[in-house]
Amino acid sequence: MTKGIGKLKKIVYPRAGGVETIQIVESEDPSPAKGEVCVRVHRAGVNFAELMMRQGLYGSSPDYPFTPGYETAGEVIGMGEGVDSLKKGDRVIAMTGFGGYAEKVCLDARRAVKIPDSVSFDKAAAIPVTYGTSYHMLVHLGRMVRGETVLIHHAAGGVGTAVAQICNALGASLVIGTASAPKRDFVESLGMRFVDREGEDFVDVCKNLTEGKGVHHAIDPVGGEHLLRSYKSLRKGGKLYYFGASAAVKGNRRSRISEFRMWWGMPRFDPLKLMSSNKAVFGVHMGLLEDESVFNGHLDALSR
């Protein structure tokens, strides 16, 4: 086993709150346990999930204080007992879940995947959460094929951008992206049909652009009543993917009122109606995906 030496710096959320709560602290170097690797972190991704963790809205977060950081890219500097899939010096991307905002992090070796030398750490650190989630939804769950249509909410965000790129690669015939007006040019630069989320009804747009049928796939990170409207945008046989709860977040601090409104407005889907319309509703949370073979397959495909 590789023993920890010296100290490292890491970011800590000591309690729920605004950005003023963020701390940088020193701690002992970690030592990889059996089945783990230790990674020197070169880059770490910043996601909406980390914002929700700080505000106390992320249900699977550890108790405070804790170190956030869902995804990292770096090099292996140590292995615990029984690890033979990786070696010192390997360049990897890793789904850390928590703890990634540190100079070094130990994690289950099955959640670290080697990357080619041609892929920079800058790019690699953005793969696990945004592109992993997008790939899992459209390719693994949705089995998307050329010519299908897609609705993307928060289209200018990390997952929205990744979904749009995957749609283009898979040959989608129409990609509709909702966002605020200032983001129109960016959304359209990715090949999407822009919908102003404040001034247009995306359900009507989806129906009008598909001869009244609706889209094949709808990507919703909002929740609440918004999720039901996304469902109404689907055609028969369509698929809805729910992977976030942005409706619960307003500004830089936790809002109990926003949380209540989101959960109160959550739809209840009738299995009989799902069956009769051949529709599907998926809940997606890559951080809680327990099948490492699926997860690693996604990362391996995306990093090449």
Where do the PLM segments sit?
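Local beta-strand N-terminus motif with an aromatic residue
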Residues: G89, G147, G191, G214-V215
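A glycine-rich helix->loop->beta "capping" turn
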Residues: L209-H217
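Short glycine/proline-centered loop/turn elements that form peptide/ligand docking sites
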Residues: G80-S85, G177-F186, E198, G224-H226, ...
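NAD(P)H dinucleotide-binding glycine-rich loop of Rossmann-like/cofactor-binding domains
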Residues: R40, M52, D63, R91-H154
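Mid-domain Rossmann-like dinucleotide-binding core that forms the NAD(H)/NADP(H) cofactor-binding site
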Residues: A125-E200, D204-V205
